[in-house]
Structures are given as C-alpha cells and as structure tokens.
C-alpha cells in the first residue's frame, strides 16, 4: 500500500495502466469532454473546493479531471468499499489529486477516508460536496448535530454505524467545532443516486437540510439511462465475472421494478434467464407484468429460483429465512446502493468460504449453500467494473452542470432539494447524440407553436415522465 503524500491508493505503480484506460474512456464520454471545451477557459469552478464521495472508477477519473479542468480543487474517496478500480485511483493520485480509495478497504478505513476528503492541506474547508449515497453529507451533518449537543451517536443500529460513530467521535475530540464550521462552509451538494436523494428529501422535510442540494439522480438523462441502460449491461457482467454461471434457462428473481429493476430484469432476460419480479408498488408491478414478467411473492419462488437480485433501495428485502430455503448454490446479489437489502449481518455466524475476492460460499446447517456476491454490496462494481463509460458520461455531465449551478449562484437557491432544469437535461442528451450518429428532426415554427414549445426546446413539461 502506498501512503506517501496526500493520498492512499493500493499501488501508485498502476498509474500508467490507469491513464491508458482513462484515455480510452474519454473517447466514450462526449458530455464531459464537451464541458471541458465549453467551460475550460472560463473556469466557473475556480475557488470551488469539492469533496467527492463516489465510486473511484475509470469513468469517475474522467469526471474528476473535468472538475479540475473547470477550475476546482478536488479531494476524493469511493462511496463503496468494493467499487474502487485501483489503477484509476493510482492515475488520479499521480496527477496530483488527493484520492483515498482501495478496492476491498475495511469499513474502518472507509470512514477514515471519508474524513480525509474534508481535510485540506492548508487547513481550509470544503465548500461543495459531490455525493453518491449521501455518506459524505451525513458525516458532516451528524458531526455537527453531535457538536450541538444532540444525542445522535449513542445508539448504533449496525456494525457500520458503530464504526461511523467512532470516527465522528475521533474527529470531535481532535478538532472541536470543526463539523459545524465545515457544515456552514458548504454552498451546496449534488447527489448521484436514489438512496442519497431519499436522505436529502427526508432532511428537507424535517427542516434539517442546511444547504441547497441538487438531485442529479432524477435528471431524466441520469435515472432513465444510468439506472436502466447501465444496469442492463453491468448486472450480467458482474454475475458472470463472479460465478462463470450460464444464465440461459435459469430462473432469476429481481426484487423491485423501478428503473434499476427494469434494467436488471432486461439484463437477465437478455442473457436467457427466465425472470420473475417482486414488487410492492402496484404501478411498477403492472409495468412488470405488461413487460412480460411474472410478478410473484418472494416466498413462493425462494426454493425454486437460481439467482436472486435486489434492486429496491429498501432494507431486509432478502432475509435469512428466505436464504435458508434457497436451493443449493443459489446466487444472491444486490445492485442497490447499500448492503442492507440482503440480511448479510444475520449470516455472519454461518460457515463462510471465500472463493475469490467478492465471492463467498455460505453454508447453512442443513447443508445447502448460497453464493453471495460482494457481501451484499453493489455487485456490478464489486464483481465487475460498473456501468460503461458512455452512459456514465450522461450522469457525470449532470453532476458537472449541477456543481456549476450551485457554486456560481450562491443565494439563488434555498435550503431545499432541486432538480436541474429541463433545458439542461436536454442539453446533456444532445451532447451524446453525435457519438451514436443520431440526427434530430427540426420542428418548424408552426409545429412548435402547435404543441406550445420553442423549436429549440425544451420539448416536454417538467412533469412529463418519459
């Protein structure tokens, strides 16, 4: 492990390999490269000190270097202990950006690294957060609440919360008052994923959100592309790399049929699996049924299916009682943000055999075994390398525009959660059309007036669902 200077990566010697893959990814990320061309000279992020907590992949490296090209200073950690690509982290560290990320890092190190991305060499403070899942934001807000005398650290509900609370207490002891100062210095946060967005909305509803936030996840060019088309390619990739199992003919259960569930079901179906769906929402259940999937109760298929994938963003979706009933060598994995969709903690007292990194064989007393991927964390990033560069370009272009929006317009946004305006959503889509050879039909003035839009757009109302 290399710990010199202001970074922690697995092997700085991987930097050249990482740089080669970054160069390839740049050709597949036209949105980010267009942002560099459009904003690089003006440097709208000059003065921004961005704390980034997002999967440290090759694609994220292109995002980081785009933010730097636009004038920002950046410190970065991964938002998942298994999602880092070590050569990507090495390349970014070698380029002079402080990064703290190792594939397979411990939970203790994860929260130490989350603390480090707020610790600037000159003792200054971050003024922007770019988050995925909300951990960096929650770290600061929990610490500030503790400094205010609230009893928020005395009752951890999980092993991870216990570790998080210990790290907060360590920083409280070392730097009294720091959390409050850091919270007050933040101009805004941009949030990448459904889980983190839900956290922000809950804070906003309670009046506890201390700075403006942009919900990047619900930009159409994020949720309808990254969540759906990204999962459509990366889920099966992760299962194959982890298990080498043939999916054709297997029975696969997808828990949840939101955008991630839709992409996951399509991924498995495209590989030849016979897909069944579980769903609590009647609208999503009807969509699944009309897309041709059998919508079932998990309890009715748990002993007969071969593959189980959670996509819900909820907790305890697959519980230990379910896993006890699974057939021998059933594959269990998650593609939602956190690891609590599968009741992994309840499996810890069973016999675990590590097959290879992020693949574990867990044996129940009656002799049946399950294959657990990435310990219940994101299997497409733990067992594979996540979504392809092209679809991540759309997501990360939204992130870049959102960072510019909040940083350059202080005072224009209240302490609420916002979505990028429709014209920017359409702009992100436009930036990716040439790469695919797409030609847009041009509306005449008369046609545009007939449907109540401008010929150049936006073409849909904010409530249009796509």
From Swiss-Prot:
Enzyme Commission number(s) of this protein: 3.13.2.1
GO process annotations (BP): L-homocysteine biosynthetic process; one-carbon metabolic process; S-adenosylmethionine cycle
Subcellular location: Cytoplasm
The reaction(s) this protein catalyses: S-adenosyl-L-homocysteine + H2O = L-homocysteine + adenosine
CDD domains: SAHH
Cofactor names: NAD(+)
Entries under SUPFAM superfamilies matching the protein: Formate/glycerate dehydrogenase catalytic domain-like, NAD(P)-binding Rossmann-fold domains
Alphabetized UniProt keyword annotations: Cytoplasm, Hydrolase, NAD, One-carbon metabolism
Free-text cofactor note: Binds 1 NAD(+) per subunit.
GO molecular function ontology, one term from the record: adenosylhomocysteinase activity
Stored Pfam families: AdoHcyase (PF05221), AdoHcyase_NAD (PF00670)
Record keyword NAD present: yes
Residues where substrate binds: 57, 132, 192, 222, 226
Positions of NAD(+) binding: 193-195, 227, 256-261, 279, 314, 335-337, 380
Assigned GO CC terms: cytosol
The keyword Hydrolase belongs to this UniProt entry's keyword annotation: yes
Assigned protein family: Belongs to the adenosylhomocysteinase family.
Described function: May play a key role in the regulation of the intracellular concentration of adenosylhomocysteine.
Protein name in the entry: Adenosylhomocysteinase
């Amino acid at each position: 492990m290399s710990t010199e200077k202001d970074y922690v990566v697995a092997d700085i010697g991987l930097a050249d390999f990482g740089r080669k893959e970054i160069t390839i990814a740049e050709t597949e990320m036209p949105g980010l490269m267009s942002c560099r061309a459009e904003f690089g000279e003006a440097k709208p992020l000059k003065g921004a000190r961005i704390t980034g907590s997002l999967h440290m992949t090759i694609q994220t490296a292109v995002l980081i270097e785009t933010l730097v090209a636009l004038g920002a200073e950046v410190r970065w950690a991964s938002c998942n202990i298994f999602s880092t690509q070590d050569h990507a982290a090495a390349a970014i560290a070698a380029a002079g950006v402080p990064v703290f990320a190792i594939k397979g890092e411990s939970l203790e190190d994860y929260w130490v690294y989350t603390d480090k991305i707020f610790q600037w060499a000159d003792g200054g403070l971050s003024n922007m957060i770019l988050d995925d899942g909300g951990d960096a934001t929650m770290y600061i807000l929990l610490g500030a609440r503790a400094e205010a005398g609230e009893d928020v650290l005395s009752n951890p509900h999980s092993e991870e919360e216990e570790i998080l609370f210990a790290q907060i207490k360590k920083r409280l002891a070392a730097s009294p008052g720091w959390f409050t100062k850091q919270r007050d210095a933040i101009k805004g946060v941009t949030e990448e994923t459904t889980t983190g967005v839900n956290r922000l909305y809950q804070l906003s509803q309670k009046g506890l959100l201390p700075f403006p936030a942009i919900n990047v996840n619900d930009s159409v060019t994020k949720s309808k592309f990254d969540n759906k088309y990204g999962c459509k390619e990366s889920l099966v990739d992760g299962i194959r790399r982890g298990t080498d199992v043939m999916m054709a003919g297997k029975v696969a259960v997808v828990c949840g049929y939101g955008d991630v569930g839709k992409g996951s079901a399509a991924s498995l179906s495209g590989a030849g699996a016979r897909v069944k769906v579980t769903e609590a929402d009647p609208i999503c259940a009807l969509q699944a049924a009309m897309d041709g999937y059998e919508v079932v109760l998990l309890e009715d298929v748990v002993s007969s299916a071969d593959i189980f994938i959670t996509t819900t963003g909820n907790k305890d979706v697959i519980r230990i009682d379910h896993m006890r009933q699974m057939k021998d060598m059933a594959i269990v994995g998650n593609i939602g943000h956190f690891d609590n969709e599968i009741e992994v903690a309840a499996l810890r007292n069973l016999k675990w055999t590590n097959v290879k990194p992020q693949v574990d064989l867990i044996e129940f007393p009656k002799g049946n075994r399950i294959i657990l991927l990435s310990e219940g964390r994101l299997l497409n990033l733990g067992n594979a390398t996540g979504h392809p560069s092209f679809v991540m370009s759309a997501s990360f272009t939204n992130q870049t525009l959102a960072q510019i929006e909040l940083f350059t317009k202080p005072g224009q946004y209240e302490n609420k959660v916002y979505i990028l305006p429709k014209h920017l959503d359409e702009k992100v889509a436009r930036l990716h059309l040439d790469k695919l050879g797409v030609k847009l039909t041009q509306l005449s003035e008369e046609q545009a007036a007939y449907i109540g839009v401008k010929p150049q757009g936006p073409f849909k109302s904010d409530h249009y669902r796509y």
